[in-house]
Amino acid sequence: MTLPLAGRTALVTGASRGIGAAVARALAAAGARVGLVSRATDQLQALAATLPHEPVVLPDDLTHAPAAVTVAAGALEAFGNAPDILVLAAGTFPLGPVVGTTDADLDTAFALNAVAPLRLVREFLPGMRSRGAGHIVFLGSVADRYVFPTNAVYAATKHAARAAAEAVRAESRGTGVRTTLVSPAATDTPIWDPHEPDAQAHLPNRDQMLRPEDVADAVLWAVTRPAHVDVDELRLSRS
């Protein structure tokens, strides 16, 4: 049986845990050679040891501007070209009232959730266009439309990510490069650990959340559609 992504390459940010790790597993299981990006080197190496098709470990901190260039250079060296699939799953999840939010909170959240994806797209989109094919997946959130008290910073970054995805899609129309925004509801990953959602009345219990594999399934479905099919956006919620 031929795997749907056999011979393809993919780069996944935030791949050390949670949704990013689940996406990396799903793409590798479908035949892709996967590049793994995160600052958690040990976790990346542990994940890589479980994946087929010679995964590539590219540890870096995407909150720093030079990281996009370094990651791109490593991916180009390993793959020989821009990846066929770029999944922008790295993110941070600050919660708290606006009053009391620190400059560090703001800088980190926007750097990782909003700015880093654009830096990576800037590095890889020209190669995808020259090849006439590529697929960029932005990991969004229902917070790009739904805002509640204490998630002002996170929601603002995800509104920015939505705008970026829509702009990249519009700028790439007719080039063979597709862009998909995948926006899940609350998903049970370690990103929730500091917030103890089961103890907070305004937050969903963890057993009511999506699983990382649910989101990975959606990403895999989007990137395995025929080349003439654009999946602009997928919004996922728990039934």
Regions found by a protein language model. Give the residues of each.
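Active-site loop immediately N-terminal to the catalytic Tyr-X3-Lys motif
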Residues: 99, 148-152
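C-terminal helical subdomain
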Residues: 174-182, 202-239
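Substrate-binding pocket helix/loop in short-chain dehydrogenase/reductase
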Residues: 97-98, 105-110
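Active-site helix of classical SDR
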Residues: 121, 157
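Conserved glycine-rich Rossmann-like NAD(P)H-binding loop of the short-chain dehydrogenase/reductase
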Residues: 30-47
